[in-house]
């Protein structure tokens, strides 16, 4: 089987998980990593130990200036300017842009100067086309050189919203994500001029925050453009988040009918492994390490009337999202004829 030679720019946040996910996907081979702020020895440490997901079960070391994972050597660079990263010299045709800095088409296109042929941004983008696995991959065309995998929350919300809209029609809706702490937050109160609440201590507060995840669904499902918006609450847990989608339906349905529809969709070829379904009495830690984008919690939702319903879906905002980035990469490469 042929493999996709891949580069990663930014070895922080969820990217140790993405590298781990790539090891499980025989179609993807990471050949180079760039991060100007992390030295090689620390990179080994970050990959080996994780407070939430535990120790890496394989082998990781550094040798001759390279990161070696399960015996596989990965070149490491420390360039600040994406245009200076020599992706081409490593045969890395595809690059995952994960710094959270170069999120526009223009900024991410700098990787093309170093020899990359395609860039996948692991964050929402203001102008790059966004794709969500299981939702709108049919819209991808090979002429696109910079694309976005949207956000972890959009990846949770969009599959659920698509199933509901396709079967019952969504007239309008509000989304709230109860979101685990992320590395951008403050451990204790500190300066945050643009977001005063965001400057408060993450471990001591439930923090209301903004999110563009619901509006972004309108970009991947155009029929829902302008019909959804939302907000977030940041909570002091290390991983796993949950979406609360409250919608007004066009077609009346009982909650049991809605559950059955979602369960059937979760077993379909299109959404199997993407949208999960559970009737267990679960809590957030039950989903640590879950690779689904979205796991519908049938016991947590409620209904006020046949056209007004609240739906709940969980997601591992680290591991689940990282898995989807690798899946998107493999899909795109297949469509490009690289596999």
UniProtKB/Swiss-Prot annotation:
Record: active site: 152
Compartments, as annotated in UniProt: Cytoplasm
Gene Ontology MF: a single term: glyceraldehyde-3-phosphate dehydrogenase (NAD+) (phosphorylating) activity
Positions bound to NAD(+): 13-14, 35, 80, 317
Pathway: Carbohydrate degradation; glycolysis; pyruvate from D-glyceraldehyde 3-phosphate: step 1/5
InterPro entries hit by this protein: GlycerAld/Erythrose_P_DH (IPR020831), GlycerAld_3-P_DH_AS (IPR020830), GlycerAld_3-P_DH_cat (IPR020829), GlycerAld_3-P_DH_NAD(P)-bd (IPR020828), Glyceraldehyde-3-P_DH_1 (IPR006424), NAD(P)-bd_dom_sf (IPR036291)
Residues with site note (Activates thiol group during catalysis): 179
Record-listed E.C. numbers: 1.2.1.12
Catalytically driven reaction(s): D-glyceraldehyde 3-phosphate + phosphate + NAD(+) = (2R)-3-phospho-glyceroyl phosphate + NADH + H(+)
Keywords: Cytoplasm, Glycolysis, NAD, Oxidoreductase
Annotated D-glyceraldehyde 3-phosphate binding sites: 151-153, 182, 211-212, 234
Recorded GO CC terms: cytosol
Gene3D superfamilies for the chain: Dihydrodipicolinate Reductase, domain 2, NAD(P)-binding Rossmann-like Domain
Signal sequence range: none
A Pfam match: Gp_dh_C
The keyword Cell inner membrane is annotated on this UniProt entry: no
SMART domains: Gp_dh_N
Annotated GO biological process: glucose metabolic process; glycolytic process
Main location: cytoplasm
Enzyme category, top tier: oxidoreductase
Assembly notes: Homotetramer.
Family per record: Belongs to the glyceraldehyde-3-phosphate dehydrogenase family.
UniProt protein name: Glyceraldehyde-3-phosphate dehydrogenase 3
Species of origin: Mucor circinelloides f. lusitanicus (Mucor racemosus var. lusitanicus)
């Amino acid at each position: 089987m042929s493999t996709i030679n891949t580069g990663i720019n930014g070895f922080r946040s969820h990217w140790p998980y993405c590298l781990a996910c790539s090891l499980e996907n025989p179609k993807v081979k990471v050949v180079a990593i760039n991060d100007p702020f992390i030295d090689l020895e620390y990179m080994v440490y970050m990959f080996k130990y994780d407070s939430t997901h535990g120790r890496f079960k394989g082998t990781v070391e550094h040798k001759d200036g390279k990161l070696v994972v399960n015996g596989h050597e990965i070149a490491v660079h420390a360039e600040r300017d994406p245009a200076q990263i020599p992706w081409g010299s490593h045969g890395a045709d595809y690059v995952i842009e994960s710094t959270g800095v170069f999120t526009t088409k223009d900024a991410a296109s700098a990787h093309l100067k170093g020899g990359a042929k395609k860039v996948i941004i692991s964050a929402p983008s203001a102008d790059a086309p966004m794709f969500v696995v299981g939702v709108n991959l049919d819209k991808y065309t090979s002429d696109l050189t910079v694309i976005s995998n949207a956000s972890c929350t959009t990846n949770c919300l969009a599959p659920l919203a698509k199933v509901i809209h396709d079967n019952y029609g969504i007239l309008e809706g509000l989304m709230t994500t109860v979101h685990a702490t992320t590395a951008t937050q403050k451990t204790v109160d500190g300066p945050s001029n643009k977001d005063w609440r965001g400057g408060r201590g993450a471990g001591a507060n439930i923090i209301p925050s903004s999110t563009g995840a619901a509006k972004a669904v309108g970009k991947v499902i155009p029929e829902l453009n302008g019909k959804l918006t939302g907000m977030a609450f940041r909570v002091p847990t290390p991983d796993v988040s949950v979406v609360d989608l409250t919608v007004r339906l066009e077609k009346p349905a009982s909650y049991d009918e809605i559950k059955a529809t979602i369960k059937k969709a979760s077993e379909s070829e299109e959404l199997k492994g993407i949208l999960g379904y559970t009737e267990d009495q679960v809590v957030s830690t039950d989903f640590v390490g879950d690779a689904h984008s979205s796991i519908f919690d049938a016991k947590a939702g409620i209904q006020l009337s046949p056209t007004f319903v609240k739906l709940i879906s969980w997601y591992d905002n680290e591991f689940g999202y990282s898995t989807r980035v690798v899946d998107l990469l493999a899909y795109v490469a297949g469509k490009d004829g690289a596999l």
